[in-house]
Amino acid sequence: MRTPIIAGNWKMNMNPEQTAEFVKAVKDNLPAASEVEAVIAAPAVDLPALLENAKGSDLKVAAENCYFEDEGAFTGETSPKVLKEMGVDYVVIGHSERRDYFHETDEDINKKAHAIFRNGLTPIICCGESLETREAGKAEEWVANQVTAALKDLSAEQVASLVIAYEPIWAIGTGKTATADQAEEICAVVRKTVADLYDETVADKVRVQYGGSVKPANVKELMAKENIDGGLVGGASLVPDSYLQLVNYKN
């Protein structure tokens, strides 16, 4: 049984004070970690406040990015080794905003995945197609290629433990949501790609999230789908009430 995982991705929002207030507002109302894993991915500047205030609760903490080296002359980068030392659980990599604005390549994302595992953290690897690619009928091929490149040379055991987030670029922050059927269709492609690269056992264990205008109004329908194990949620994760509705979608 795959444990559902709902992760809020704050992007470049919230300061440490707001972070502390947010955690205090949600931490006593989270589902048991065995029921639904509740995660917040926060900017690096907010991680200390997030970790400090989440202590003793079921809230898991994710960084929104890291570098593929542990230390050195890499001005402005975040060390995966230090993230682990701080107590971070997950690292989001390959988000379409990182690929688009900061020119991250599939190779960069694969190197980061290896660095994250090397340091005992778990990656949440994002993939997804543009509207242009979808309209050209190439969404499935595009996503399969992204997943294949991201997982290069990872062990079966590593892949079984990671999270892959399918985020159609055309549905991020646009108010357009892929229908639950569209989301399920590509999440199934993600799982099939893992099965083709590894085997059915690994594919059955990997958790696949859908991201792209996920909100309390549509989370239940999405989570009912066979191949959708969670959500990577942007805007709706910035408000304690809506975040709690998302992570407690079973109730």
From Swiss-Prot:
**Which top-rank group of organisms is this from?**
Bacteria
Q: Which GO terms describe its biological process?
A: gluconeogenesis; glyceraldehyde-3-phosphate biosynthetic process; glycerol catabolic process; glycolytic process
Gene Ontology cellular component annotations, sorted alphabetically: cytosol
Q: Which GO terms describe its molecular function?
A: triose-phosphate isomerase activity
Please name the catalytic residues of this protein.
95 (electrophile), 167 (proton acceptor)
The reply on keyword tRNA-binding is no
Keywords on record = Cytoplasm, Gluconeogenesis, Glycolysis, Isomerase
| Subunit structure, interactors included | Homodimer.
Similarity section: Belongs to the triosephosphate isomerase family.
Q: What is this protein called?
A: Triosephosphate isomerase
Natural source organism:
Ligilactobacillus salivarius (strain UCC118) (Lactobacillus salivarius)
Lineage runs:
Bacteria, Bacillati, Bacillota, Bacilli, Lactobacillales
Designated gene of the protein: tpiA
